[in-house]
UniProtKB/Swiss-Prot annotation:
GO terms for cellular component: cell surface; membrane; nuclear inner membrane; nuclear matrix; nuclear outer membrane; plasma membrane; sarcolemma; secretory granule. It comes from the Eukaryota. It comes from Mus musculus. Residues 1-22 form the signal peptide. This is Growth hormone-releasing hormone receptor. Pituitary gland. Gene3D superfamilies: GPCR, family 2, extracellular hormone receptor domain, Rhodopsin 7-helix transmembrane proteins. The chain crosses the membrane at residues 131-151, 168-188, 211-231, 241-261, 284-304, 332-352, 358-378. Belongs to the G-protein coupled receptor 2 family. The gene is Ghrhr. Receptor for GRF, coupled to G proteins which activate adenylyl cyclase. Stimulates somatotroph cell growth, growth hormone gene transcription and growth hormone secretion. CDD domains: 7tmB1_GHRHR. The keyword Transport does not apply. PROSITE patterns: G_PROTEIN_RECEP_F2_1 (PS00649), G_PROTEIN_RECEP_F2_2 (PS00650), G_PROTEIN_RECEP_F2_3 (PS50227), G_PROTEIN_RECEP_F2_4 (PS50261).
Length: 423
């Protein structure tokens, strides 16, 4: 069996099994490598003008055989792609005879085998991951929609901090929806057309996916910034600029994503814009994300330092310290929960740690929206109190239309005063 026939059979096997590696089908890696190798082989053949050699350079569909003199033989290793299936990749030998190149020996299926049982195992593994992240995103969308409805419907919960919560909820909904849109646009079936598609829908889905990811990180950062400003406020007039956070939280991701789209259109308008992990344009997206994760972690440490000072017995009564802790505990949980593993992975190559990265980012990451809704809404004491009042039939007209702000004053020697909402 020659290289072209074996390559075609491998593609059929990969497409049949639907194996996925990372965010791409495994057959896309195979097709990409074959195209690159074929192009390099043809370019090398064009630069060789020596017609005295017995066998000219040729591409057999899988390997590039260099020009060789009559009576000589060449041995080449199997393509690098086969290392996905094990470390024991063999060599293929061909002789240059008077009549031309001999058949490969040993045959490609023997020298470069593809174990079907391994493909079946990988199919089962990634199918399970897909079921998990589809379920996780679906649960997250439902929980986040309910949480937004609660915070919007209960007027006593209207305050800047809860407004920021709703923005964060919206970014998780956008992120989950972008995953479904991208899957529908790129992986529509078992064919390999998605490996080379260049449709507008495909590119738009990738752009929306990047925008959703960036807005998600920006509003997680906004939560930390707002809490830091709130805890460090030294005057009733030093309120955080909420609308500046709104502008930055949505505007900067739109600006970065728009710049990335312009870069792709100008310099790399090929295929679906999804194969760009080594592209300079990719840092327009990845750079701000890495920066936001680093800043968020710094704010996390700063918030801890502020709380340690404010929770000292000399800095206020038991009620005041309880208010500070209740205000901060959700954000203190979320920042390390959603940031530490990104700090680790952002400084590793994109191909490193796939066995950990895939289930962590696609599987567990799909439940982040649900966790946010639980911490910021369903377990929030004020939210539960308001729902109880509505549920047990208290007349909402007898209650204030809006929650009043509470002024917390520390002992005179500290000369610190904090003006904030309890929610």
């Amino acid at each position: 069996m020659d290289g072209l026939m074996w390559a075609t059979r491998i593609l059929c096997l990969l497409s049949l099994c639907g194996v996925t590696l990372g965010h791409l089908h495994l057959e896309c890696d195979f097709i990409t490598q074959l195209r690159d190798d074929e192009l390099a082989c043809l370019q090398a053949a064009e630069g060789t003008n020596n017609t005295s050699l017995g066998c000219p350079g040729t591409w057999d569909g899988l390997l590039c055989w260099p020009p060789t003199g009559s009576g000589q033989w060449v041995s080449l290793p199997c393509p690098e792609f086969f290392s996905h299936f094990g470390s024991d990749t063999g060599f293929v030998k061909r002789d240059c005879t008077i009549t031309g190149w001999s058949n490969p020996f040993p045959p490609y299926p023997v020298a470069c085998p593809v174990p079907l049982e391994l493909l079946t195992k990988e199919k089962s593994y990634f199918s399970t991951v897909k079921i998990i992240y589809t379920t996780g995103h679906s649960i997250s969308i439902v929980a986040l929609c309910v949480a937004i409805a609660i915070l919007v419907a209960l007027r006593r919960l209207h305050c800047p901090r809860n407004y920021i919560h709703t923005q964060l909820f919206a970014t998780f909904i956008l992120k989950a929806s972008a995953v479904f849109l991208k899957d529908a646009a790129i992986f529509q079936g078992d064919s390999t057309d998605h490996c080379s598609m260049s449709t507008v829908l495909c590119k738009v889905s990738v752009a929306i996916s990047h925008l959703a990811t960036m807005t998600n990180f920006s509003w997680l950062l906004a939560e930390a910034v707002y809490l830091s400003c709130l805890l460090a406020s030294t005057s009733p007039r030093s309120k955080p600029a909420f609308w500046w956070l709104v502008l930055a939280g949505w505007g900067l991701p739109v600006l970065c994503t728009g710049t990335w789209v312009g870069c792709k259109l100008a310099f790399e308008d090929t295929e679906c814009w999804d194969l760009d992990n080594s592209s300079p344009c990719w840092w327009i997206i990845k750079g701000p994300i890495v920066l936001s994760v680093g800043v968020n972690f710094g704010l996390f440490l700063n918030i801890i330092c502020i709380l340690l000072r404010k929770l000292e017995p000399a800095q206020g009564g038991l009620h005041t310290r309880a208010q500070y802790w209740r205000l901060s505990k959700s954000t203190l949980l979320l920042i390390p929960l959603f940031g530490i593993h990104y700090i680790i992975f952002n400084f590793l190559p994109d191909s490193a740690g796939l066995d950990i990265r895939v289930p962590l980012e696609l599987g567990l990451g799909s439940f982040q929206g649900f966790i946010v809704a639980v911490l910021y809404c369903f377990l929030n004491q004020e939210v539960r109190t308001e729902i109880s009042r509505k549920w047990y039939g208290h007349d909402p007209e007898l209650l204030p239309a809006r929650r009043t702000c509470t002024e917390w004053t520390t002992p005179p020697r500290s000369r610190l005063k904090v003006l904030t909402s309890e929610c």
